[in-house]
Design a protein with these regions (language model features):
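FAD-binding subdomain of flavoenzyme oxidoreductases
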Residues: 6-161, 379-395
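Conserved, mostly hydrophobic/aromatic
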Residues: 111, 290, 357
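C-terminal structured "cap/appendage" subdomains that terminate the fold
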Residues: 309-352
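C-terminal substrate-recognition/cap domain of FAD-linked oxidoreductases
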Residues: 121-125, 131-308, 315, 319
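Short beta-alpha connecting loops at secondary-structure transitions
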Residues: 13-16, 133, 297, 331-338
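Small/polar glycine-rich anion-binding or flexible loop at a beta-alpha turn
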Residues: 166, 283-286, 328-335, 369-370
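Intrinsic disorder at enzyme termini
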Residues: 344-395
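Short acidic/histidine-rich active-site segments
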Residues: 281, 322-329, 364-367
Length: 395
């Protein structure tokens, strides 16, 4: 399998580029580039294990995607094999390449269009100075308003993460990160640049978060303290697993200014379904990861959890967001795709898939819902006895 294609083919420090096979672990790229003072910016929580090929398939982000972008913004080129066995080289190390941007199309296509066999990524110089701020709040809505306040000041942190009370307590007990367990929410805000820039930004950010209700602000400037703060965040998912036998991780995006309202609505859904929710997410770019806690051994809880998760994603669409940020669609979110896209848009997805993979060999049944499925959900209706786009597969 592709997991065995795990070689770093070249590190070019002069041009800040790495060429790797798809099975190379995300973190391994930064480890290999560290000797040159470089690193690869996208850093999903699973970076110790996830592969760069998987990152391309899902267009993964991570803590630092707010400032440095998603996978699509950091991949310069890919070599891809089509379902017909043809080899395509898309993108490259030049500033711009002519023709349509097929590289961007491949990023996030979930393996439905081609098989990536090689990836060229850009590397960045490590910033000269970094500070990580922990801001604690007595209300999660206040933390949400603080996020909008910081971005509204024109400040783009390297990373901006939020955790609610359940997540904070679980992570602190698991990782001993120094989180205040009495907080209803915390923000972790990373700032980077020159020493003078970081000091000036830290003062501005502290002022904004305090104006929005932060009762405790700690700033870590040494590497060990920063690592300890981030360890808690990156351990949050396994830590939350200690609170219940099972959890269901959602992944949706919303406009930042809707953050406080959406968190309040998620709290209302949690009460309605009597299912606890731990919120751990990339607050800076509005990428939510509500973790619904449940016990699959209790009759009806799994079904209730899936229904509640679907309603959270539909809420994201309702406020102008999307049903996925970085975890993809697969089969899990096919129903919600019918909510976000209409039949005309789905038609274009089908035609694109058919152009790349006419026999439907690559990851079939994923990513794009059939029109019949959407019809059953009420997302598409028969008009005067005729179905739209009759040339497309109904199943």
């Amino acid at each position: 399998g592709l997991s065995k294609m795990n070689q770093i083919l070249a590190i070019d420090p002069d041009n800040c580029v790495a060429r790797v096979q798809p099975g190379v672990r995300n973190l391994a790229i930064s480890e290999a580039a560290a000797a040159h003072g470089l690193y690869y910016a996208p850093d999903p929580s699973s970076q110790i294990a996830c592969s760069i090929g998987g990152n391309v398939a899902e267009n993964s982000g991570g803590v630092h995607c707010l400032k440095y972008g998603l996978t699509v913004h950091n991949v310069l080129g890919v070599r891809v094999m089509t379902s017909a066995g043809e080899i395509l080289d898309l993108g490259g190390t030049l500033l711009d390449t002519p023709g349509l941007d097929l590289l961007a199309l491949l990023c996030g296509s979930e393996g439905m269009l081609g098989i990536v066999t090689e990836v060229t990524v850009q590397l960045l110089p490590k910033p000269p100075a970094v500070a990580v701020m922990l801001a604690a709040f007595h209300a999660i809505t206040a933390a949400g308003e603080a996020v909008a306040g910081v971005i509204g000041q024109g400040i783009i942190p390297a990373g901006m993460e939020m955790m609610d009370k359940l997540a904070v307590q679980a992570a602190e007990q698991f990782a001993k990160a120094g989180y205040p367990e009495d907080a209803d929410a915390i923000l972790l805000i990373e700032l980077d640049g020159t020493q003078a820039e970081v000091e000036e930004l830290a003062a501005r950010v502290e002022r904004v978060v305090r104006e929005n209700g932060a009762y405790q602000v700690d700033i870590a400037t040494d590497a060990d303290a920063q690592m300890r703060l981030w360890k808690g965040r990156k351990s949050a998912f396994p830590a939350v697993g200690r609170l219940a036998p099972d959890y269901y991780c959602m992944d949706g995006t919303i406009p930042r200014h809707q953050l406080a309202m959406v968190l309040r609505r998620i709290g209302e859904l949690s009460a309605e379904y009597a299912l606890p929710v731990a919120n751990v997410f990339h607050a800076g770019d509005g990428n939510l990861h509500p973790l619904i806690l449940f016990d699959a051994n209790q009759p009806g809880q799994l079904e209730a959890t899936e229904e509640m998760g679907g309603r959270i994603l539909e809420l994201c669409v309702e406020v102008g967001g999307t049903v996925t940020g970085e975890h993809g669609v697969g089969v899990e979110k096919l129903d919600q795709m019918c909510v976000q896209f209409d039949a005309t848009e789905l038609q274009q997805f089908f035609r694109l898939k058919e152009a790349w993979d006419p026999q439907g060999l690559l990851n079939p049944g994923k990513g794009i819902p059939t029109l019949t499925r959407c019809g059953e959900l009420g997302g598409m209706h028969v008009r005067h006895g005729e179905l739209p786009f009759s040339e497309l597969d109904r199943f």
